[in-house]
Amino acid sequence: MSNIIKALEQEQMKQDLPKFAPGDTVVVQVKVKEGNRERLQAYEGVVIAIRNRGLHSAFTVRKISNGEGVERTFQTHSPVVDSIEVKRRGAVRRAKLYYLRERSGKSARIKEKLAKK
């Protein structure tokens, strides 16, 4: 029985997702429906958490909007998420970056990960 469920979930999962990790700055293109038309809205911020649960995977992106911290959680394989683009890789040593919630300004910066040769 569980093999059938796994097969169905595998069928629903997106295959074209880039590899990203906490600390990375990403741009998520979100499908927004306004009346009878649909458009794409870009949401750019730092990934502060990733939840890997197969089809139910999710990630949280934090950005500062008008001086106020805004977090949004996206379902990774949701049809609402059109695309994910990694802008820069961050060098962090934690899986969850919840400590960024209490920080602002220069203390909330994340070092950039240098590419391997």
Swiss-Prot record:
GO terms for molecular function: structural constituent of ribosome. Disulfide bonds: none annotated. Keywords: Ribonucleoprotein, Ribosomal protein. It holds the Pfam family Ribosomal_L19. Gene3D superfamilies: 2.30.30.790. One of its GO terms (cellular component) is cytosolic large ribosomal subunit. GO terms for biological process: translation. It comes from the Bacteria. This protein is located at the 30S-50S ribosomal subunit interface and may play a role in the structure and function of the aminoacyl-tRNA binding site. Belongs to the bacterial ribosomal protein bL19 family. This is Large ribosomal subunit protein bL19. It comes from Vibrio vulnificus (strain CMCP6). The lineage of its organism: Bacteria, Pseudomonadati, Pseudomonadota, Gammaproteobacteria, Vibrionales. The gene is rplS.
